[in-house]
Amino acid sequence: MSESNIPESVSYSDSHEWIQVESDIATIGITDFAQSELGNIVFVELPEIGEYAKRGETFGTVEAVKTVEDLIAPISGEVLEANETLEEDAKQINEDPYGAGWMIKIRIEDEEQIEELLSSSEYADIINE
């Protein structure tokens, strides 16, 4: 059973991204479970401002010591901001995945996609299977 931190204040995707909604802006990152499975994260590649993130498709990559994983957009929208501090200090993803380790902010295109995300308890069920 996992001892991951699963805040109730955010929603989740089954590909281990979290999403926090404020008005029409969504902040996205990877979950505590994902960062712990990856191990020490050494590099992250994020999209440029103005690019389009499409739900279910890759918006970037995260590189750990022994693996590289795609980052999958949990919803669609225009990228408004990318966390550039991660380029110099990717370990923030390991240290604070729901805070300083956030990855991108996008303008929400379709609010119905938010409804389809997982709650904290639904996400916990997935990672504890």
Role assignments for model-derived ranges:
Residues 1-58, 91, 95-129:
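Acidic, low-complexity mobile loops and tails
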Residues 11, 45, 63, 69-73:
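Small beta-strand-rich domains/subdomains or short beta-sheet motifs embedded
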Residues 16, 62, 71, 76-79:
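Conserved hydrophobic positions within beta-strands
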Residues 32-34, 66, 75:
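Short glycine-rich, polar/acidic loop-and-turn segments at beta strand-coil junctions
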Residues 35-36, 49, 78-79, 85-86:
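Short, charged/polar surface micro-motifs in flexible loops or helix N-caps
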Residues 56, 62-63, 82:
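Residue-level recognition of conserved beta-strand edge/terminus positions
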Residues 64, 84, 108:
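Short, conserved catalytic or interaction motifs in soluble domains
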Residues 76, 80, 87-94:
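Charged, amphipathic alpha-helical coiled-coil/dimerization segments
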